[in-house]
Amino acid sequence: MRQTIKQTTLTVLLTILCSATMSSQELLDDVISRVQFHGYAQGGFNYTHKAGEDTPTFELKRVLFWTNAQITDRWSFLFMHDFSSVVQEFYTDYRLTNNKALTVRLGQFKNGLSYENPLSPTSMEAIDVYSEGVTYLTGCGSDPLLGVQYGRDLGLSLFGETNNGKLRYEVDIMNGQGINKRDGNKEKDFIGRLEFRPVKGLNLIATGQIGRGHAIASSLYMGTDENGDPLIKEGDNYRRNRWTAGFDYKSKAFNVHGEYLEGKDASVTSRGAYVTGNVPLGKGVDIVGSYDFFNFNTALGMDQHKVIAGLQYWFYKKCRLQLQYVYKSAYTTKTEFIHGANHAIMAQMQIRLDYAGKKK
């Protein structure tokens, strides 16, 4: 009798253990299927000739890692860190509709201003990544009033698409101060974005921003007032409006995108345009070219022309080697905007890896 009880008890325990083991494995498989991991690095060598001086230097521009988790079929979360700088993004998305018509996003993410800003550097033709106007107007780094914010901000976004993806919209409500920072004033910045795809391969984009900035430093681009003081000083709140209109066309023969941009900081107007593209030559090799014009202050004539020409070789999926010549017609010092030619030869390697768990 005792032997029978022992055997029965052992059988029950083994059954429970096997069931728990299977449940744990199923849970682990489910978690793995919902999580994706991504990472890339960009680094290389730059040789610059400016103001009669030559500057050769190796650069490690970006080392990014990010993971996104699909918590439910509607709810997801993303975290991104740049090991060469700071935490870049952390946000959660929740899809409110059964289709893709409306999703809400809360956290820190790229703002929707301009065509280029939301795009990854791994997909851009230029080693410099974005055009001068996009870099300046979206807070990617060249505007001293805002500082280096990588085109990102803290806030709330509503976005979605309709008509089988032909129409896409986005509305952002942002602090306007950049990454990992509290708002510097009481006002919020509003950014709108509208995309329309009338035919296969063509995307038309219009974006705009209305808001008030809080200056973290003065800027030589703003000029001075009648007393010789900076027009916008550190700590000042000022009007900051922008708008853009652009296009993107992709085909087997060539890819090209371009945009007109304009900004208003207090009473200072900036505007410009660019066109960038590439032509595949075969076997992973592309010709890359870009023309870029931007006037940082139209009243003071702070205009700059920029030309890029080069080659890129895709040796594995999203991994490539890039070699480019860059010409600019102007440059800045700490106190001056100078019209003068400067040249650069840039070489860069890009490595990107993506991992997604198998969906059940």
Each model region followed by its residue ranges:
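Outer membrane beta-barrel transmembrane domains
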Residues: 279, 284-314, 318-326
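Detector for outer-membrane/organellar transmembrane beta-barrel domains
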Residues: 197-297
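Outer-membrane beta-barrel "beta-signal"
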Residues: 339-360
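Outer membrane beta-barrel
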Residues: 26-48, 53-176, 186-191, 195-204, ...
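Sequence/structural signature of outer-membrane beta-barrel proteins
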Residues: 44-50, 74-76, 113, 174-181, ...
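Bacterial N-terminal signal peptides
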Residues: 11-20
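Bacterial N-terminal signal peptides that target proteins for export
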Residues: 1-10
